[in-house]
Amino acid sequence: MSPADLTGTGRAVPVPGAGLDPGVIAHVAVTATTLWVEPRTHRPDVDGPSLTNPVALDAWNATMQDIETRRWLTGKLESQAVLGSEVIVDEIDGDWARIVVTAQGTARDPRGYPGWVPTAHLVVDEDFAQRAPTSPTATVTALTSTLSARRSGNHPGIDVSFDTILPVLGRTATAVRVAVPGARPACLPAEDVVVHEAGETPPLPTAEDVIATGERFLGLRYLWAGVSAYGVDCSGYTYTLFHHHGISIDRDAGDQMHHSGLEPVEREDLQRGDLVFFATAPGGDSIRHVALYLGDDLIMQAPNAERSVEVMSLTAYDPTGEYAGARRVALAD
């Protein structure tokens, strides 16, 4: 992690990429790491900014302004995991690691979502691992924020994404001091986070809460496998919206429909906040897309590499009748 590991005093900083033996618990040590289907299949001149430490996700997006360059990622990426995410290391192949992200449910692996990431994006940090489940936590509510070595924010560090969750070490009226994997403690602006006490369950959101959160992403460019404020895909978008409000649903659209245990809903009974699903063909069971229902035949979605997060008519989106059903997440009234 850089700049200069968020320069400060205190503990020795663990080295990213060290000690990554199979079976080890590690944590993501960059803004967001992108999981690949296979290692070393990236385009160096395009995807390089997403593979360094620190990552440069804005620069990565800038290399993919045209549709075909962005669409190339389809089927080559698995998911993303933001700073502080817990992972299990399964395999090491040179400077790549096969991991599972424990917070992202999938029918593919009961432990979490699998994929390959650069070893430099991971750190074995025992101090962070001990604090994560027992400390108050700061969840980033801003789309992006910046970790700083000083409470004043005048010593910038690295960017952090929406829904990044880090252990709290202390706080003032203007800043929250957090533990950072693979780095010394750093500060986030208090206005950019919400703090929950250890063991505290966030209040159950209403449909309006979830929709309001989703509306903040309108205009964000689609990114296959994305779950961060630097780009989302359809199910990464819905997963992140509910996860931010303390509700766990599976990572992929098909699993959200078939394996998350959510209540089935008939089309005539749709309510705001329901998840609506679309199949690869009319009447099919293979799910290709999910969107958030807004009422009045409107959906909010991350559609494809050609577009950005948007609101549009459900009927207009589905002229060929690929609507496959809906599920309802339990929400507050």
Spans of model-derived segments:
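Short, well-ordered loop/turn sites that connect or cap secondary structure elements
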Residues: G75, A81, V160, D269-L270
